[in-house]
């Protein structure tokens, strides 16, 4: 990418990919307990897709996830992928992922930190587009 961000070694990539799998599973199933395993308690959720800032704490975000019908419960096929993973340092990573839920196609910029021997999302900043179909 550049000389500031680097590619993770295979072991680190695997650890981050496993954390992202929990993230994808949690969103697809609307499972807040899974999401709580991958989000740091002080994490921030933010977007400006609709023209104003939406910024939530996990205490605000998790009840929203819990209250909405999950993609799995609606019979949706799972549509998620990892676009890139880069390190800013040994305990700081940026993962760019894509996923779709209903008519929304999301690009998530997930800043991750390694604390307590595991990778955790400390910020989720995202954009979404609506499917034309």
Can you annotate each of these PLM segments?
Residues 15, 24, 44-105:
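Surface-exposed, charged secondary-structure patches
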Residues 1-33, 37-41, 59-60, 131-133:
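Short, low-complexity N-terminal intrinsically disordered segments enriched in polar/charged residues
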